[in-house]
């Protein structure tokens, strides 16, 4: 059975509502016996009035009979209302009729209302009050709005929402899914841009091929360079036209030639500034494949050898036996 909990509704069956309507439309009481006088009209008219919002229409005949019965005998109507409100048949939790009856009981319990007014509220003739309570129930059951939505509504954010915004059960739009989808799409686009940028790496510059000058062109350029190291614009253009070269080729050739000349000049200056080597008399050891020294002279190394720099004694190509003799003499010392 469906029971109304705190702020929640248990689902019900439409077929159960239709069955209840047919049973109550058969002029029979919930207990299966006729009610006291005047009650049958009120109980029979109640289901049609209670279900007017569910089925979209009301039975005009039942409403008319209810109004006539109310106008004819208010006392019997009050008795019927009290009996229907207190009896288990008027409070059925198996269908939405129980919710309607509960709402109308709330409307009927408003202080200051007369018995006739209570009967009219119970039968659905006074509908604005019941609709107000129903609206309050819907507001209580609706999900609470989040802080972000409240701040957006307060700040007056009227930005248009896309059709793909999801709708929550309470009717509130949830833009989170769209934002996630947008971020995912932007992440996908960013990933695609990065993939496109990776193969677009800067290509290594192609090595420029050197211009091949003929011997006649080089000879003429050398002759002009020895005569004039710097050329003006018209002179460069005239020389390039005479040699069938471009002005850029002539300009670069003169630049390279000036740099080459400068390096040669610096090397010559460095050699000129170096100290001159001293000339030392050296005894000839071998001449015409004949030894010019005694065996004991080679064993005595010169006394000034450790004190003098090595560049004073140039290297001589000695025969193998002389080198072995020098090594043996060094080992004995």
Curated annotation (Swiss-Prot):
InterPro entries per the UniProt record, alphabetical: HD (IPR001356), HD_metazoa (IPR020479), Homeobox_CS (IPR017970), Homeobox_NK-like (IPR050394), Homeodomain-like_sf (IPR009057)
A GO term for molecular function: DNA-binding transcription repressor activity, RNA polymerase II-specific
GO biological process, one term: pancreas development
Keywords: DNA-binding, Homeobox, Nucleus, Repressor, Transcription, Transcription regulation
Gene, per the UniProt record: Nkx3-2
DNA-binding residue intervals: 206-265
Gene Ontology cellular component list: nucleoplasm
Expression sites by tissue: Expressed widely in mesoderm at the gastroduodenal junction (at protein level). Expressed in visceral mesoderm and embryonic skeleton. Expression is restricted to immature proliferative chondrocytes during endochondral ossification.
SUPFAM superfamilies in alphabetical order: Homeodomain-like
Presence of keyword Transcription regulation: yes
Biased composition (Gly residues): 179-191
Subcellular location: Nucleus
Protein name: Homeobox protein Nkx-3.2
SMART domains: HOX
Pfam families: Homeodomain
Compositionally biased residues, Basic and acidic residues: 137-148
Family from the record: Belongs to the NK-3 homeobox family.
Function comment: Transcriptional repressor that acts as a negative regulator of chondrocyte maturation. PLays a role in distal stomach development; required for proper antral-pyloric morphogenesis and development of antral-type epithelium. In concert with GSC, defines the structural components of the middle ear; required for tympanic ring and gonium development and in the regulation of the width of the malleus.
Lineage start: Eukaryota, Metazoa, Chordata, Craniata, Vertebrata
PANTHER family, sorted: HOMEOBOX PROTEIN NKX (PTHR24340), HOMEOBOX PROTEIN NKX-3.2 (PTHR24340:SF34)
Oxidoreductase in keyword set: no
Positions of region (Disordered): 74-121, 137-212
């Amino acid at each position: 059975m469906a029971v109304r909990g705190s702020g929640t509704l248990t689902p019900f069956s439409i077929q159960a509502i239709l069955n209840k309507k047919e049973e109550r439309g058969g002029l029979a009481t919930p207990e299966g016996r006729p009610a006291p006088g005047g009650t049958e009209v009120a109980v029979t008219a109640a289901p049609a009035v209670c279900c007017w919002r569910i089925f979209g229409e009301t039975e005009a005949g039942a409403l008319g009979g209810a109004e006539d019965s109310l106008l004819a005998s208010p006392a019997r109507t009050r008795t019927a209302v009290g009996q229907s409100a207190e009896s288990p048949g008027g409070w059925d939790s198996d269908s939405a009729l129980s919710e309607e009856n509960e709402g109308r009981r709330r409307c009927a319990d408003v202080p200051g209302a007369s018995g006739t007014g209570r009967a009219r509220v119970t039968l659905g003739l006074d509908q604005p009050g019941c609709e107000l309570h129903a609206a309050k129930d819907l507001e209580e059951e609706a999900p609470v709005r989040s802080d972000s939505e409240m701040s957006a509504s307060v700040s007056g954010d009227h930005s248009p929402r896309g059709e793909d915004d999801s709708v929550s059960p309470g009717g509130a739009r949830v833009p989170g899914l769209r934002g996630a989808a947008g971020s995912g799409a932007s992440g996908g686009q960013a990933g695609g841009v990065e993939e496109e940028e990776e193969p677009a790496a800067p290509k290594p510059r192609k090595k420029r091929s050197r211009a091949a000058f003929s011997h006649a062109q080089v000879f003429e350029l050398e002759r002009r360079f020895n005569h004039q190291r710097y050329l003006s614009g018209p002179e460069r253009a005239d020389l390039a036209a005479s040699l069938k070269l471009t002005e850029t080729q002539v300009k670069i050739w003169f630049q390279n030639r000036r740099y080459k000349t400068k390096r040669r000049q610096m090397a010559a200056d460095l050699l000129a500034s170096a100290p001159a080597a001293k000339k030392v008399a050296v005894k000839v050891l071998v001449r015409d494949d004949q030894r010019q020294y005694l065996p004991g002279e080679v064993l005595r190394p010169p006394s000034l050898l450790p004190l003098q720099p090595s560049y004073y004694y140039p290297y001589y190509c000695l025969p193998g036996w002389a080198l072995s003799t020098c090594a043996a003499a060094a080992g004995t010392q």
